[in-house]
């Protein structure tokens, strides 16, 4: 018999965005409204969601890649395979969100090289964050230096505004 721990639910409001946090068997997952926006936008473009979230285990490190209010999606379309790390950039400090996103992106990309090398990793960011923060000289330099692929999404229209490879 498996000893099942009860789920604990908590609701947090940050800058008007509601985040539902679910703790279950020692793992914490959180999901904000932008997860579903990106998922819908990908499906509108013909992508099939294959993993939600994408679980990766590399070298003794397990990544459920479902951190904070973000979630990693895996999708396929006509033989193409992608993974998408979704960020909302809702905190008052965009640079703090950026530091977290850069670290996660590098870790996830390295893990994918081990476990699923044909899958391309994209960082999904809202159109407002792209226009307000990601066009700055420093941010652009980091994106270019680390060869990030961006997926820019429109929260209101639930569409992908830009694929930047």
What is the role of each PLM region?
Residues 14, 18-59, 75:
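Acidic-basic catalytic patches of nuclease active cores, encompassing PD-(D/E)XK
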Residues 3-15, 149-165:
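Charged phosphate-binding loop/patch that engages nucleotide di/tri-phosphates or the phosphate backbone
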Residues 86-98:
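Short beta-strand-loop-alpha-helix junction that forms the active-site gateway
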Residues 48-82, 97, 164:
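Active-site metal-binding core of divalent-cation-utilizing nuclease and nuclease-like domains
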Residues 100-103:
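A general alpha-helical scaffold signature found inside nucleotide-binding enzyme cores
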Residues 82-84, 122, 149-151:
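Hydrophobic/aromatic beta-strand patches that form the interior of the parallel beta-sheet core
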């Amino acid at each position: 018999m498996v000893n099942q721990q009860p789920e604990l639910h908590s609701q947090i409001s940050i800058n008007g965005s509601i985040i539902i946090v679910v703790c279950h068997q020692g793992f914490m997952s959180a999901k904000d409204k932008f997860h579903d926006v990106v998922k819908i936008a990908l499906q509108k473009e013909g992508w099939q969601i294959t993993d939600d979230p994408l679980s990766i285990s590399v070298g003794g490190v397990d990544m459920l890649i479902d951190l904070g209010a973000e979630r990693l999606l895996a999708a396929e379309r006509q033989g193409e395979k992608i993974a998408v790390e979704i960020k909302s950039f809702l905190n008052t400090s965009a640079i703090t969100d950026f530091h977290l996103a850069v670290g996660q992106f590098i870790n996830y990309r390295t893990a994918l090289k081990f476990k699923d090398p044909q899958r391309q990793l994209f960082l999904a960011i809202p159109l407002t964050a792209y226009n307000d923060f990601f066009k700055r000289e420093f941010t652009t330099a980091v994106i270019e230096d680390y060869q990030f692929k961006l997926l820019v999404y429109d929260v209101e229209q639930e569409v992908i505004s830009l694929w930047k490879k």
